[in-house]
Amino acid sequence: MRDETPERAAPLRFGYTTGSCATATSLAAARLLVAGHADDAVEIVLPKGQRVMMRLEFCRITADGAEAGTIKDAGDDPDVTHGALVFARVALSAAPGVRFHAGPGVGTVTRAGLTLPVGEPAINPVPRQMMTTHLDALAAEYGYAGGFDVTIGVEGGEALALKTMNPRLGIVGGLSILGTTGIVRPFSCSAYIASIHQGIDVARANGIAHIAACTGNTSEDAMRAHYGLPDMALIEMGDFAGAVLKHLRRAPVSRLSMCGGFGKLSKLAAGHLDLHSRHSSIDLPLLAQWAAEAGANDALQAAMRAANTSQEALKLALADGVPLGDLVCAHALRVARDIVPASVAVEMFAIDRQGRFVGSAR
């Protein structure tokens, strides 16, 4: 078996979510208003009880309240928001409670199916609870009986959001404020997986019965051209086939098409639900075994086992009349059907690097 990219040996550094950044900055701005303290760092408590100190870039009085900002540090995770300035603007109110608003760079929900109602700022439930808990504790500590209006922003967030799935999910105008633990674990890709789930939920809520889960742009284009599906029906799953299949257990659709490059699909066919090379490898001997079951002779099997890439193995098989693409799709289909409810009609498509279909099964 060949792994396509080397694993990173050095320990990876964790970071903090945008939800943690929003909590720290809103607390700092509120404390400046309630207690008169301007901090250069602030301690917050994460959902699992860890206490962390977060550095502030500024904390200052404004014309209508106070504001504070921090630089988002995602550690060694390839996070689109790493290095962005996350800020909070807080105003005191006579009405008790905490009210949230979308500032520059934070999106607004425009479609049903997400965890937030249409019209709400895209500040997810856990960050909202984190901020509310900290602000309630601050009010109790200083005997403040009023409420807080909290506006969260991300500098450059509207442009950064175009690199995320927010536009497709119907979150317009900027990023989402995310996080369930407050911590970004390198390469956990929890935000990406959450966006896959949200994409399925949005499609269901908007009456879409047929979705296509695709590994990338080329497979998306292939599915769009083949079926004429709207963007809302196209789920960009990347390497996370398992995230799609497992979510359909509790949020089923009538029909699922999965489409990806031949190499990626061969990993799913072998039973791997994470298709990234860090977690699964292309098994050329297994491809040769499947080819043998379809009539491949010994010479072809040996050539496939010695191939440099899955694409080379596919080319060898097809040249000898062995429908390896269909075989891989059939095995991938069996893996998927073992996970999703029987009510979901599943089909598989494999494509080459040019986006041409090289195999299918249904």
From Swiss-Prot:
Keyword Transferase carried by entry: yes
EC numbers, comma separated: 2.1.1.195
The family this protein is said to belong to: Belongs to the CbiD family.
HAMAP family per UniProt: CbiD (MF_00787)
Pathway membership, UniProt: Cofactor biosynthesis; adenosylcobalamin biosynthesis; cob(II)yrinate a,c-diamide from sirohydrochlorin (anaerobic route): step 6/10
NAD is among the record's keywords: no
Organism from which the protein derives: Burkholderia ambifaria (strain MC40-6)
Official protein name in the record: Cobalt-precorrin-5B C(1)-methyltransferase
Top-level taxon of origin: Bacteria
Matches recorded under Pfam families: CbiD (PF01888)
Record field: catalytic activity: Co-precorrin-5B + S-adenosyl-L-methionine = Co-precorrin-6A + S-adenosyl-L-homocysteine
Coiled-coil regions listed in the entry: none
Keywords in alphabetical order: Cobalamin biosynthesis, Methyltransferase, S-adenosyl-L-methionine, Transferase
Any one GO biological process: methylation
Molecular function terms from GO: cobalt-precorrin-5B C1-methyltransferase activity
